[in-house]
Design a protein with these regions (language model features):
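Anionic-ligand binding patches
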Residues: 2-3, 10-133
Length: 133
């Protein structure tokens, strides 16, 4: 059995389904990790994985995800939550005006094992759209 430490329990099901194919049972452990900021996904993931492992006392999984806009390579990346909160829908519309709306949603899954980060990456290509309530 392996734990996924997350403050967002709906993230559990897709990971549990994938790991079940490998005969690995996954359990969710709700845990609030600090919101780490860095321009590098792996730097954020490594710090989160180490903190989670230390808090739980055993290796466990953590994730980090973000949006990558083709018009702005590498942006916003791991800073997606901060950028969306700061700019809002209208700011994102202005940012993308006249540029490509192609984007990738990137998700990393990581585990801190014996002082080393093990990680996996998945991507979903899409077109960025701004939705208004």
């Amino acid at each position: 059995m392996l734990y996924l430490l997350t403050s967002n329990p709906p993230k559990y099901k897709p990971f549990a389904d994938l790991l079940a194919q490998l005969q690995i049972a996954l359990r969710v452990h709700e845990f609030e990790l600090p919101e780490l900021q860095d321009e590098d996904f792996l730097a954020v993931l490594g710090r989160k994985a180490r903190l989670a492992c230390e808090a739980l006392g055993e290796p466990c999984l953590v994730d980090d995800a973000g949006l990558l806009l083709d018009a702005y390579p590498g942006f916003p990346g791991p800073l997606t939550r901060y950028v969306i909160k700061s700019l809002g829908a209208s700011g994102l519309e202005r940012l993308l005006a006249g540029t490509s709306n192609r984007a990738r949603m990137v998700c990393y899954l990581g585990c801190w094992v014996h002082g080393e980060l093990w990680h996996w990456r998945g991507e979903k290509f899409m077109r960025a759209a701004v939705f208004r309530p």
